[in-house]
C-alpha cells in the first residue's frame, strides 16, 4: 500500500482531512516518483545480467544445489531457480515503483516458506540468491539509489529466512 493510500485510510478512519504534515509527505513521495521509476527501468533493463550473475555466484557458493540430487541439478531445474530469482527481482521493482514493501509482502512472501519447505528447496539458498542479486544490483547504482533499492532486497531477505 503506497504512502498516499495509507495516509488517506488513516485520515478517513479518524474522520478527518489530511494534515499539513501528511500533505508534505505526499508531496515528497510524488516528487521522488520520477527517480523511483528510473530505478525500476534500470533494474528491468539489467534483469538478465543481474539474475545471470547472481545465479553464477549462488551456484559457486552452494555447489550442492547443482550437484546430482541438488535442487538445481540439470538444465530444467537450474532454469527454474533462475526463474524464481527473476520473480523476486520483479517484486523488488514493484516495491521500488510503489515506494513501499506491500508488493513484496502481498505478492511474494505469503506462503513462500511453506511452499519451498514442501518442495525441499533450501530456503537459505533462496535468501542467499536474493542477497547475491542485491549485491550485484547495488554495485550498479549510486549511493542514494543503491540504498533505496537495497532496503527492499533486505526486506525480502529477512522475510525469506
Curated annotation (Swiss-Prot):
SUPFAM superfamilies: Globin-like. It holds the Pfam family Phycobilisome. GO terms for biological process: photosynthesis. InterPro entries: Globin-like_sf (IPR009050), Phycobilisome_asu/bsu (IPR012128), Phycobilisome_asu/bsu_sf (IPR038719). The modification N4-methylasparagine is found at residue 71. It is a peripheral membrane protein. It is found in: Cellular thylakoid membrane. One of its GO terms (cellular component) is plasma membrane-derived thylakoid membrane. Keywords: Antenna complex, Bile pigment, Chromophore, Electron transport, Membrane, Methylation, Photosynthesis, Phycobilisome, Thylakoid, Transport. (2R,3E)-phycocyanobilin binds at residue 81. Contains one covalently linked bilin chromophore. Belongs to the phycobiliprotein family. PANTHER family: ALLOPHYCOCYANIN ALPHA CHAIN, PHYCOBILISOME 32.1 KDA LINKER POLYPEPTIDE, PHYCOCYANIN-ASSOCIATED, ROD 2-RELATED. Light-harvesting photosynthetic bile pigment-protein from the phycobiliprotein complex. Allophycocyanin has a maximum absorption at approximately 650 nanometers. Component of the phycobilisome. Heterodimer of an alpha and a beta chain. This is Allophycocyanin alpha chain 2. It comes from Microchaete diplosiphon (Fremyella diplosiphon). The lineage of its organism: Bacteria, Bacillati, Cyanobacteriota, Cyanophyceae, Nostocales. The gene is apcA2.
Amino acid at each position: 500500500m503506497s504512502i498516499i493510500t495509507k495516509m488517506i485510510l488513516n485520515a478517513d478512519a479518524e474522520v478527518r482531512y489530511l494534515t499539513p504534515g501528511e500533505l508534505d509527505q505526499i508531496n515528497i513521495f510524488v516528487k521522488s516518483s520520477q527517480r523511483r521509476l528510473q530505478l525500476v527501468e534500470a533494474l528491468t533493463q539489467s534483469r538478465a545480467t543481474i539474475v545471470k550473475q547472481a545465479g553464477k555466484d549462488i551456484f559457486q557458493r552452494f555447489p550442492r544445489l547443482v550437484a546430482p540430487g541438488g535442487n538445481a541439478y540439470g538444465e530444467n531445474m537450474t532454469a527454474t531457480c533462475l526463474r524464481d530469482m527473476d520473480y523476486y527481482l520483479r517484486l523488488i521493482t514493484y516495491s521500488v515503483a510503489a515506494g513501499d514493501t506491500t508488493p513484496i509482502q502481498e505478492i511474494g512472501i505469503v506462503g513462500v516458506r511453506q511452499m519451498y519447505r514442501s518442495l525441499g528447496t533450501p530456503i537459505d539458498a533462496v535468501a542467499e540468491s536474493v542477497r547475491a542479486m542485491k549485491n550485484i544490483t547495488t554495485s550498479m547504482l549510486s549511493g542514494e539509489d543503491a540504498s533505496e533499492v537495497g532496503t527492499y532486497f533486505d526486506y525480502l531477505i529477512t522475510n525469506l529466512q
